[in-house]
């Protein structure tokens, strides 16, 4: 079992915690993590892009000039693709980019991402982090105490004040422990998690 230090919000070590091998100690599988990240990004795409074909562009119903005798190239419509303001050939149309990844693959990718954070000493476990009211300054102080600029902060579900306090800080994101994803774990330099959240992660993803 990997053992990591536990800190208070001031950055002082107050103990240690053993993390489950089945979640934080699995072999890091880079191809699987890559596939999970691609899947996450694809599922975020809106797919609302759209261009007009020659049949959808306004105008162009009349033949611009007669077929023969003008010396010019024959043309059937001023909305053909070769014309300025003409229709687009094979342009993007609205589509759904999302696709499903097998649950086992998604779970393995997430465990690999968590294990990579432990392996690379990029995990910070806090004894607790609770706020009575939204206070961005408190989160800024926390990051400063650990000399961190980029971090994913993971707390138990319901810690709304922590989420509200961190959302305006560039390079910082808050997630609830039962809503983790591989992309966000890998995106940020540090993975900051409370002891309570560790228990939830181990229970949900073990």
Curated annotation (Swiss-Prot):
In residue numbers, the region (Disordered) covers: 45-75
Coiled-coil ranges from the UniProt annotation: none
Q: Which GO terms describe its biological process?
A: translation
Write out the GO cellular component annotations: ribonucleoprotein complex; ribosome
Keyword rRNA-binding carried by entry: yes
Q: What does this protein do?
A: One of the primary rRNA binding proteins, this protein initially binds near the 5'-end of the 23S rRNA. It is important during the early stages of 50S assembly. It makes multiple contacts with different domains of the 23S rRNA in the assembled 50S subunit and ribosome. Forms part of the polypeptide exit tunnel.
Indicate what this protein is called per its UniProt record: Large ribosomal subunit protein uL4
Gene symbol here is rplD
